[in-house]
Amino acid sequence: MIAEAKITSAEEAADKIIEDAKKQGESMKREALLEAKEEIHTQRNELEKETRERRNEIQRFERKLEQKEESLSKQQKQLEQKEKEIAQKDEKITNKEQELEKIYQQQVEELENLSGLTTQEAKDMLLNRVREDISHETAMMIKEMESRAKEEADKKAREIITTAIQRCAVDHVAESTVSVVSLPNDEMKGRIIGREGRNIRTLETLTGIDLIIDDTPEAVILSGFDPIRREIARLALEKLVSDGRIHPARIEEMVEKAQKEVDEQIREEGEQATLDTGVHGLHSELIKLLGRLKFRTSYGQNVLNHSIEVARLCGVMAHELGTDVNTAKRAGLLHDIGKAVDHEYEGPHVTIGAELGKKYGESSNVLHAIATHHGDEEPETIEAVLVQAADAISAARPGARRETLESYIKRLEKLEEIADSYKSVEKAYAIQAGREVRIMVKPEQADDETSINLARDISKQIEAELDYPGQIKITVIRETRAVEYAK
């Protein structure tokens, strides 16, 4: 009985659970249905709202399209109207062109009848005249451009040369052909002369230098055209005077020592010249020859100093022109190298210098510059032109080269005298140390052609009557002035 009661109780409990579950399930079902309906309602409202918005947008777009269609329709009508107007104008223009063509043909026929020329003949005549005018204008334009280019080139050249001179300004000391050796007392003169003059004869024989012993107190003058031999004699004599032992054997010994010292000095001077100019890689023999130039002069100007100055001028001008500075300086330093041995070889120093440069491995540009620096050949490289210019600048610098004062003044006076001898000359001035004669002519007595002939005549007379180094420039100036006053 108890078991049946438990079973009945369990069944009732199970039925109750099932009932409760059914109720709970129905409740959840109803809630789910309600939620689904609410979701559907919400989505429907959103869809309707979106649909309305799209509909409104479409309506707005349709209205815009309608407005554009109306605008296009108006524009089309306007274009059609303009096309009609243009067509009418084209027709009028065509008619006008036809009328003008008829009038033109009539005028051409009338002109042909009046001039007796056909249209082609008149055209050819006009073209020929135009060609002549164009040719004349072209020639004038070319002449003007050439003149302008020459002025610019001259201006640039003056700037470059001025810069070079300013940057390479050096002092000049004129060299002479004598040296003076100081003596401690006048008794030393007798010892130098020696018994029956044997000492002085030995020294003169060994050195080739004349010893002048006169009334000059405590001094002996050495005279000779070869500066190297004169320097050897000077050093030897100074050593003999300092030593006090003067006899032929001692003289020979001192001359030999002096010779070695001068050789060493020559080498040192050559090396110093290359260092001063920044020229490297020279053959040792060329360096020695450069050193020998220290003892050479040209019109009183030391040739080594002149060569160093030319090298520096070439370097500055080459830098300004943007060309090879090293080659220009090298050519400038070696341009007078032939003067170191020109008394030992036959021929001008430019030819000797070029041969020496070729012998010791210098480049063709350097050799060409050496060979052309005196104008014997036409320069074909910029370095050769620079060497010519620098050589002229160095030589023409006031005080660089020296003549005797008397001959110098006489030459200047003679230059002015020759120029003043012509009737059309008003004034004449010898300037640039006698390297230029500037002549003012009377404009009423000399025209342009006469001035050209005058310059030629004066230059010929100077060539015939005067001896001078280098060349003299003759400049004839003709000036006409017209003066009026505005009141």
UniProtKB/Swiss-Prot annotation:
Alphabetical list of PROSITE patterns matching this protein: HD, KH_TYPE_1
Residue ranges, annotated region (Disordered): 36-55, 63-83
Domain of life of the source: Bacteria
EC number: 3.1.-.-
GO cellular component: plasma membrane
SUPFAM superfamilies: Eukaryotic type KH-domain (KH-domain type I) (SSF54791), HD-domain/PDEase-like (SSF109604)
Molecular-function GO terms, alphabetical: RNA binding; RNA endonuclease activity
Keywords, ordered alphabetically: Endonuclease, Hydrolase, Nuclease, RNA-binding
Enzyme class of the recorded protein, top EC level: hydrolase
Domain KH: 177-240
Domain annotation HD: ranges: 303-396
Family: Belongs to the RNase Y family.
Function text: Endoribonuclease that initiates mRNA decay.
Descriptive protein name: Ribonuclease Y
Gene it is expressed from: rny
